[in-house]
Design a protein with these regions (language model features):
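N-terminal carbohydrate-binding accessory modules
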Residues: 79-125, 250-296
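Cleavable N-terminal signal peptides of Sec/SRP-targeted secreted and luminal proteins
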Residues: 65-84, 574-586
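Aromatic-lined carbohydrate-binding/catalytic grooves of carbohydrate-active enzymes
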Residues: 294-319
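Extended, alpha-helix-rich binding/interface surfaces that flank or overlap catalytic cores
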Residues: 535-563
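An active-site-proximal structural segment forming one wall of the substrate-binding cleft
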Residues: 278-296, 317-344, 357-393
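C-terminal GPI-anchoring signal of eukaryotic secretory precursors
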Residues: 562-574
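Active-site region of glycoside hydrolase catalytic domains
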Residues: 90-95, 106, 252, 349-510, ...
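Lectin-like carbohydrate-binding module/patch detector with strong preference for beta-trefoil
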Residues: 119-253
Length: 589
């Protein structure tokens, strides 16, 4: 479209020039007669001579016109084929996420966690305790808020406790209702009644493989009594035989490996060493060169809320992400790549996942204190990068969950965040991520959040849902065309924010897919996601799981960026368009 506009803007100038120099002389033969007032030719001979001069002049000009027409036609055709509307004359966003870099995700680079002592007992790990003498599970009655018993044969949520790690051997236990186990004195009973943990809620864990002893900080051991109580009154030091102070510990889940887990697991000094090395090596200048050479024009950079307090963020977070983000902007400017800053991890966690730096899987973001702190982070980032030529946009929050984050709370936050960005940057896009979970895809389009350069981000994975588990390669491809494409088209036509597929991946649950199948699947996704009015961003640049790794996919030709049909106009159509364009231009010039 920009090419067409450019042609129309240029054409009248050239046409007027030709009209003045050439066409004007040809359109009125009497002007030619007036050039030689002393001529003895008859009027008929003069007319014939003028026509002969005109034909000679046309023969001289025709080759030049064809060359010019071909050049302009090719430029227009190239612009039509490789430019798009709706992004102020720029190409659509073809981006890659820098996931796992400034916000840690253990599954992206598991080796980061290799040297943590008691590495299977990180913050958020869910554990069960079973008395070896009673063969009953420890249970927080009603999930917490009351006393603790040792009387359940089959464990459920009441018997599941989340670890809050204090040190390698010291822990606090959070019940399913959010209350902490507490014991205020030697000989006292253990209850699940504390709102927040302190000394009385901290216990030592002595471990012998899957067996543990639990004791208070004063050294008194907890035991399961014959009356099914949990009391801090065991006499002496228990051995590892069958006794009332010994419990079998089962790890029910330990899926959280984020910034909180790595920093609190190693402790500050070792975590700083590990993360400093990671931030310097995981994404480098050469990665930006690679992206640029393969047609990527933007990066989406996840950051955590603690970046605003760099270089000395609150414990246990480790400083250094701000300097790394500055480097990314510098590299981006060098290679003409744009940056989207994405608040991926908000205080309190907006979704309970490791990539939001959740401590224990809880979604505690939606309160006034955390929301205000998040807005302060947006203010910090906007003021710092508003005038940087590499800034493309700021995403106010990544993947808030439904129903954990109520829509009205989210919309209010987005509106305030939009105003903050606009205070500093009139040209930056403000990006609102859809809620994940059970949410209406149209809900943000109905919310009327801002009216200038706004974008809605949605994430598409043929994963994370049992629906996709048994789909074949063909089924997955058809799902992209039959389900994703209509939704993208509907959102494109919603007369609201632009549409951004901010995360997608060339991976699925197909166990036997070969290279050709992955190529077809990738092509299908590119066909559809290229239709999004703002563009797309692949998740992620590097990953221990190769099909999630953008660079691996490109180098091994499992993802072919230039082969999707939406990136191409068939060659015969190109040729026809070029011919007709040149004929038309030659005619009007």
């Amino acid at each position: 479209m920009d090419g067409i506009h450019h042609m129309h803007a240029v054409h009248p100038i050239f046409h007027a020039t030709n009209g003045f120099l050439f066409a004007g002389a040809l359109s009125n033969p009497h002007q030619i007669l007036s050039r030689d007032p002393n001529s003895n030719l008859t009027p008929k001979e003069r007319t014939q001579e003028a026509e002969s001069d005109e034909r000679e002049e046309m023969r001289e000009k025709t080759p030049k016109r064809w060359v010019f027409a071909f050049a302009v036609g090719f430029f227009v055709l190239f612009s039509i084929a490789y430019s798009v509307e709706n992004l102020n004359g720029s190409p659509k966003v073809r981006a890659v996420n820098l996931g796992g870099w400034l916000v840690v995700e253990g599954w992206i680079k598991p080796s980061l966690f290799d040297d943590i002592p008691n590495g299977d007992m990180l913050d958020g790990t869910q554990v069960l305790f079973k008395s070896v003498t009673l063969q009953k599970y420890v249970s927080a009655v009603n999930g917490g808020g009351s006393y603790v018993t040792v009387d359940k044969d089959v464990p459920s949520s009441w018997e599941t406790f989340k670890l809050w790690r204090v040190s390698t051997t010291e822990f606090q236990f959070r019940s399913s209702s959010g209350k902490f186990l507490t014991c205020d004195s030697e000989g006292g009973s253990v209850s699940a009644t504390a709102e927040s943990p302190s000394t009385e809620e901290t216990f030592y864990i002595e471990r012998n493989r899957n067996e543990v002893h639990i004791k208070l900080l004063n050294g008194t051991y907890v035991q399961a009594t014959s009356s099914n109580q949990l009391l801090a009154n065991y006499q002496g030091v228990p051995g590892w035989d069958s006794n009332a102070a010994t419990f079998e510990m089962t790890i029910a889940a330990n899926g959280l490996h984020g910034d909180y887990q790595i920093a609190n697991g190693y402790g500050h000094d070792k975590a700083k060493e590990v993360l400093t090395k990671h931030r310097k090596s995981f994404v480098t200048r050469e990665d930006f060169r690679f992206l640029s050479e393969h047609g990527i024009n933007a990066v989406r950079i996840p950051v955590g809320w603690w970046i605003a307090q760099d270089p000395s963020p609150p414990a246990p977070y480790i400083g250094g992400t701000l300097a790394a983000l500055d480097r990314a902007f510098s590299w981006a400017q060098t290679f003409k790549i744009k940056c989207i800053i994405d608040l991926h991890a908000a205080p309190g966690s907006q979704n309970g996942m490791e990539h939001s730096a959740s401590r224990d899987g809880s979604t505690d973001w939606p309160n006034s204190e955390n929301i205000l702190q998040s807005l302060n982070v947006i203010d910090f980032l906007s003021s710092r990068y508003a005038n940087h030529p590499a800034l493309l946009g700021i995403e106010l929050l990544n993947e808030p969950s439904a129903p954990g984050v109520p829509l009205d709370v989210l919309v209010s936050y987005y509106w305030k965040g939009y105003q903050i960005v606009r205070k500093y940057a009139s040209e930056a896009y403000v990006i609102f991520c859809q809620r994940i979970g059970n949410a209406d895809p149209m809900e943000l389009y109905k919310a009327n959040i801002g009216d200038v350069k706004t974008v809605v981000d949605l994430h598409y994975y043929n994963l994370f849902d049992a629906f996709f588990n048994n789909l074949s390669a063909t089924d997955n491809i058809q799902f992209v065309y039959n389900n994703r494409q209509p939704q993208v088209q509907t959102l494109n036509n919603a007369n609201g924010p632009l549409v951004f597929i901010g995360e997608w991946v060339n991976e699925w649950s197909v166990s036997n897919g070969d290279q050709a199948a992955y190529q077809q699947y990738g092509n299908a996704q590119l066909d559809v996601y290229n239709e999004a009015s703002f563009g797309w961003s692949y998740w992620t640049i590097k990953n221990a799981r190769k099909h999630w790794d953008f660079e691996w996919n490109i180098l091994n030709k499992y993802l072919l960026l230039e082969s999707s049909s939406s990136n191409q106009i068939p060659s015969n159509c190109l040729l026809l368009m070029l011919v007709f364009g040149c004929l038309y231009l030659h005619h009007i010039l």
